[in-house]
Structure formats: C-alpha cells, structure tokens
A protein has these predicted regions:
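N-terminal nucleotide/polyanion-binding subdomain common to many enzyme families
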Residues: 1-75, 197-225
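Hydrophobic/aromatic beta-strand patches that form the interior of the parallel beta-sheet core
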Residues: 4-6, 34-36, 85, 108-109, ...
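Short glycine-enriched loops at secondary-structure junctions
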Residues: 38-41, 114-118
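Short, well-ordered secondary-structure micro-motifs
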Residues: 46, 96-98, 121-123
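S-adenosyl-L-methionine/SAH cofactor-binding core of RNA-modifying enzymes
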Residues: 63-114
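Charge-dense polyanion-binding interfaces
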Residues: 89-90, 170, 218-230
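Structured adenosyl-cofactor binding patch, chiefly the S-adenosyl-L-methionine
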Residues: 122-169
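Internal, active-site/partner-interface "lid" segment
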Residues: 143, 155-194
Length: 230
C-alpha cells in the first residue's frame, strides 16, 4: 500500500510514521508513506494556499487550485488515481470496519485541512470520502491524518508480524478486548486468573470471549447492542 499525505506541515509526520512498526514496514517495502508540501503547488510569490471566504465570515479558506495541482501530481507519480480522503469533523466517524475495507485499497491520498476548511468546489470535484476521528475540532487535519494512517497501516498484510496482533484487539470483531496479564503470576496479592495458566486452549478461548462481552457491556454498551444484532 502507498499512502500520500497532502499537508502544510510534512515535518509533523516524520517522527510518527517513520519510526517503530510503521517505519520498519516502510523499510521492508510492505508500505510506503509520502508527504507532500502543499505550498510547493502555490505559484504566487508568497506561496499562499488560503484566502478570504466569499460572503464574509471568520478565518481563511484553503484554495482549490493548489490542492488540485498537488493531487494531480500524486496521480502522475503513481500512475493511477488514488482514493482521496479529506480529514474533516463533518466526515463519517472512523470505525474499524471501514479500516478493514480500506486495507484492500492499493493507493490512498489524505488531505489535511487547515484554517476554516477547504473551498467546497474542490471537495465536490475531487474528494471521494470525508473521515472524522471524533465529534470535536482540532487546529488542523495533521493529527487526524496520523491517526488514520497509523490505524490503516497496521491492517495491511505484512506490517504486523501476525494477523492475530490486530484480529484479537478491541473493535476488530465488534467487541472490546479481554483483560490481559503478564508475569509475575501474583502481584501485590492479586493473582492472574487460573484459567490463563491452565494451558487448556478451549477454556482460555471461552474465558476470553466471556470477558470481552463483560468488558464491552460495562464500557461500551452501545457496541454490545450492535454486536448482538449480528
């Protein structure tokens, strides 16, 4: 998979997406993440990518043409049109199911918004999907783009050492993850559940499923309602 990110602040992504697991995946060739400086596609002497909104109002809007030129350049670089995502508080809230679907997409381009948003004409003509990471507003789309890119990347085959690394996690199957424990078996008088040390895989699996349901009912009852509808 290749992920292209259009942003005013490419330097923000370096320590997040080029280190640890995702960094290793890029070095191995399983994943490629490329950041594009939007100002490189603004051709006035001040490299402006924003302007005042028609009709008045607070703040500035990102102009359509620099974004269009940058996206068209991305298309030329990869030889095809990628799925174009705009990180926006107006978008659909990102869910694990959508990540599973997008993990099969070979090329994805992410637009990071800034200021008061983006000229609607650009959104209408170019954007395939708007995605939000929650019902709140941030100062820009860079942090949401990092969240999306990280969550998406780990779903790509070969990024994690074993698919069970994510198939056992919260949200993947519609439930929250079961409690987990490590050594020592007794910590400050608190013991690890005996079943986990029994070596009986069927009983362990049964315990984990029951605990996942308990945890989900306690912390996210609305998720359990959806799970029970399946």
């Amino acid at each position: 998979m290749r992920i292209d990110i259009i942003t005013l602040f490419p330097e923000m992504f370096e320590p997040v997406l080029n280190g640890s697991i995702i960094g290793r995946a890029q070095k191995s060739g399983v994943l490629e993440i490329v950041c594009h400086q939007l100002r490189d596609y603004a051709f006035d002497k001040h490299k402006r990518v924003d302007d005042t909104p028609y009709g008045g109002g607070m703040g500035m809007l990102m102009k359509a043409e620099p974004i269009a030129l940058c996206f068209e350049d991305v298309c030329k670089q990869i030889g095809k049109r990628p799925h174009f995502v705009y990180m926006s508080p107006q978008g659909k809230t990102l869910k694990q199911q959508r990540l599973r679907e997008l993990a099969d997409v070979e090329n994805i381009c992410i637009l990071c918004g800034h200021y008061e948003g983006v000229d609607q004409r650009l959104l209408d003509e170019f954007i395939d999907e708007e995605i939000s990471i929650g019902d709140y507003v941030l100062t820009g789309g860079e942090i949401p783009a990092m969240v999306f890119a990280d969550a998406l990347s780990r779903m790509v085959p070969g990024v994690l050492s074993n698919n069970e690394c994510f198939t056992e996690e919260s949200h993947f199957n519609g439930l929250l993850e079961y409690p987990q424990y490590t050594k020592p078996s007794v910590w400050r008088g608190k013991e690890v559940p005996e079943v986990l040390m029994s070596g009986h895989h069927a009983n362990i699996e049964k315990w984990r499923k029951e605990k996942s349901i308990e945890v989900t009912a306690l912390k996210r009852p609305e998720m359990l309602e959806e799970y029970n509808k399946k």
